[in-house]
Amino acid sequence: EVTKPETINYRTLKPEMDGLFCEKIFGPSKDWECHCGKYKRVRHRGIVCERCGVEVTESRVRRHRMGFIKLAAPVSHVWYLKGIPSYVAILLDMPLRDVEQIVYFNCYVVLDPGDHKELKYKQLLTEDEWLEIEDEIYAEESEIENEPVVGIGAEALKQLLEDLNLEEVAEQLREEINGSKGQKRAKLIKRLRVIDNFVATSAR
């Protein structure tokens, strides 16, 4: 995990530990040499330095090793949202246009309709529509006890994806595929393939 915004130490000109160029995370900046200099030369290949935690290997590993950062709020990755096909839209079985409306804070999405008779799960609402519903919920004569829950942005998408039971959805899709034809069948197969890949790799 990258925990510091620093890149290179201006005095030593070495990458800062836990920073964006950290050798412990991405690998050594010099072939066969750890950060602190305890291990040098190819004969120490594969050793992880007990002082600085850097593996003694070739510097080219820095080209493909990946780090990560923890964000304060969820974000949607453009590859999964805008890629062709859009994996997020396929998983949620929603048009990409609707998914974009949620991500770009143009519309709220219903996460739980509660006792409200006119709302449905995954229904989109404009801000004005949601304000009207809120007035209705909090009116004195309101009979709604179980209040509806709505969300917006990537946080709402995260909740929708967490609500999916991939194994159950896959089983349901297989049954639907057996009884469908043409374009509808092709669409169901495409969704099943994406879900099966997530199940096979245990990705969440």
From Swiss-Prot:
DNA-dependent RNA polymerase catalyzes the transcription of DNA into RNA using the four ribonucleoside triphosphates as substrates. GO terms for biological process: DNA-templated transcription. Keywords: DNA-directed RNA polymerase, Metal-binding, Nucleotidyltransferase, Transcription, Transferase, Zinc. In cyanobacteria the RNAP catalytic core is composed of 2 alpha, 1 beta, 1 beta', 1 gamma and 1 omega subunit. When a sigma factor is associated with the core the holoenzyme is formed, which can initiate transcription. The keyword Nucleotidyltransferase applies. Belongs to the RNA polymerase beta' chain family. RpoC1 subfamily. This is DNA-directed RNA polymerase subunit gamma. It catalyses: RNA(n) + a ribonucleoside 5'-triphosphate = RNA(n+1) + diphosphate. One of its GO terms (cellular component) is DNA-directed RNA polymerase complex. Its cofactor is Zn(2+). It comes from Synechococcus sp. (strain WH8103). It comes from the Bacteria. GO terms for molecular function: DNA binding; DNA-directed RNA polymerase activity; metal ion binding. Zn(2+) binds at residues 34, 36, 49, 52. Its EC number is 2.7.7.6. Binds 1 Zn(2+) ion per subunit.
